[in-house]
């Protein structure tokens, strides 16, 4: 039987683009692990993606996951849009390159053999784990230490 894991995620950006961070909480039974990091220049969507990626990449075996995010971009991207992006060689319906393709590809790879249920939660609405992830993300964004090498400012 697969382990049942809960993951909660959030991303934050102080300015968009600007310094950003992500926060994630992973819970298995009574065990809990948190993840966060801050980047000097990035976007809120990239940080939302990173939160999910880092938590999923930390799983050491195939799991049944409920992943909660307040990002419609992440939830819709992974449950709806990604299938056509892949069919079109990572291009949008308008034949433009998919934004944040480096992270979408990394998230796609991180899904692995996991069975994942994507849940959307309303942000800043008192959801305890989402609020904690928001705090982790904002604290990381306030003290960025990393460069988001995949971030490509729009020209």
UniProtKB/Swiss-Prot annotation:
<feature type="binding site">
    <location>
        <position position="10"/>
    </location>
    <ligand>
        <name>Mg(2+) 2</name>
    </ligand>
</feature>
<dbReference type="Pfam" id="PF00075">
    <property type="entry name" value="RNase_H"/>
</dbReference>
<dbReference type="GO" id="GO:0043137">
    <property type="term" value="P:DNA replication, removal of RNA primer"/>
</dbReference>
<comment type="subunit">
    <text>Monomer.</text>
</comment>
<dbReference type="InterPro" id="IPR050092">
    <property type="entry name" value="RNase_H"/>
</dbReference>
<keyword id="KW-0540">Nuclease</keyword>
<feature type="binding site">
    <location>
        <position position="70"/>
    </location>
    <ligand>
        <name>Mg(2+) 1</name>
    </ligand>
</feature>
<comment type="similarity">
    <text>Belongs to the RNase H family.</text>
</comment>
<keyword id="KW-0255">Endonuclease</keyword>
<feature type="binding site">
    <location>
        <position position="10"/>
    </location>
    <ligand>
        <name>Mg(2+) 1</name>
    </ligand>
</feature>
<keyword id="KW-0479">Metal-binding</keyword>
<dbReference type="InterPro" id="IPR036397">
    <property type="entry name" value="RNaseH_sf"/>
</dbReference>
<comment type="function">
    <text>Endonuclease that specifically degrades the RNA of RNA-DNA hybrids.</text>
</comment>
<feature type="binding site">
    <location>
        <position position="134"/>
    </location>
    <ligand>
        <name>Mg(2+) 2</name>
    </ligand>
</feature>
<feature type="binding site">
    <location>
        <position position="48"/>
    </location>
    <ligand>
        <name>Mg(2+) 1</name>
    </ligand>
</feature>
<dbReference type="GO" id="GO:0000287">
    <property type="term" value="F:magnesium ion binding"/>
</dbReference>
<dbReference type="GO" id="GO:0003676">
    <property type="term" value="F:nucleic acid binding"/>
</dbReference>
<dbReference type="InterPro" id="IPR002156">
    <property type="entry name" value="RNaseH_domain"/>
</dbReference>
<keyword id="KW-0378">Hydrolase</keyword>
<feature type="domain" description="RNase H type-1">
    <location>
        <begin position="1"/>
        <end position="142"/>
    </location>
</feature>
<dbReference type="InterPro" id="IPR012337">
    <property type="entry name" value="RNaseH-like_sf"/>
</dbReference>
<dbReference type="InterPro" id="IPR022892">
    <property type="entry name" value="RNaseHI"/>
</dbReference>
<dbReference type="GO" id="GO:0004523">
    <property type="term" value="F:RNA-DNA hybrid ribonuclease activity"/>
</dbReference>
<dbReference type="GO" id="GO:0005737">
    <property type="term" value="C:cytoplasm"/>
</dbReference>
<keyword id="KW-0460">Magnesium</keyword>
<keyword id="KW-0963">Cytoplasm</keyword>
<protein>
    <recommendedName>
        <fullName>Ribonuclease H</fullName>
        <ecNumber>3.1.26.4</ecNumber>
    </recommendedName>
</protein>
